[in-house]
Swiss-Prot record:
It comes from Ligilactobacillus salivarius (strain UCC118). The keyword Nuclease applies. Residues 8-91 form the Toprim domain. This is Ribonuclease M5 2. SUPFAM superfamilies: Toprim domain.
Length: 189
């Protein structure tokens, strides 16, 4: 039997199946966004939960859930974040469909992700990465730039970012140039 770890913050998740899987392994309260149907009332509720308990945004590694994450960050920049790697969110059975989701993640993958909670970076003056650094490292130009960004997002557990958003995402989480270089040391095509 798994010893359920207590999580004091409220986790914002996409739906009922995500909540079910999280509660299977953790003592946690969740707020479900009902897929991508987040509205102003949801944002107000999440803001209230954040004031009372703290909030961790833990959404699926797909486009719609990144949209939800951005909507929440815009209004509540101090929320915490957890990211699953895409391969950790893939259904283990072919009968479960092809969607990515927290509902498919194992206990070990969820525990690893939750152990790496991140917050928005607060001191922009210390951010040391430039657009030219990203070009030089092959994140914005080149045949494998998308794969490089995917790999980096997984290694740093900050989620995928397209070329236009990568610099902003790295700054958001206070990632240093040294951390980027370290994360990419094991990258191979």
């Amino acid at each position: 039997m798994i010893n359920r770890i207590k999580i004091s913050q409220v986790i914002v998740a996409e739906g009922r199946d995500d909540t079910t899987n999280l509660k299977r392994y953790f003592d946690v309260e969740t707020y479900e966004t009902r897929w991508s149907a987040i509205n102003d009332q949801d944002i107000e509720r999440i803001q209230r939960l954040h004031e009372l308990h703290g909030v961790i945004v833990f959404t699926d590694p797909d486009f719609n859930d990144e949209r939800i994450r951005r909507m929440i960050i815009t209004v509540i920049p101090t929320v915490q974040h957890v990211f699953l790697k895409r391969d950790e969110a893939v259904p283990k059975s072919k009968t479960k469909g092809r969607s990515l989701g927290i509902e498919h993640a194992s206990y070990e993958d969820l525990k690893t992700a939750l152990a790496q909670v991140t917050e928005q970076f607060k001191n922009e003056n210390e951010f040391d990465i430039s657009r030219s650094d990203l070009i030089r490292l092959g994140f914005l130009a080149g045949a494998d730039s998308r794969k490089r960004r995917e790999y980096l997002g997984e290694q740093l557990r900050i989620g995928y970012s397209n070329g236009k958003q990568l610099l902003k995402r790295l700054e958001l989480f206070g990632v240093t140039l040294a951390e980027v270089k370290e994360a990419m040391t094991k990258y191979s095509i």
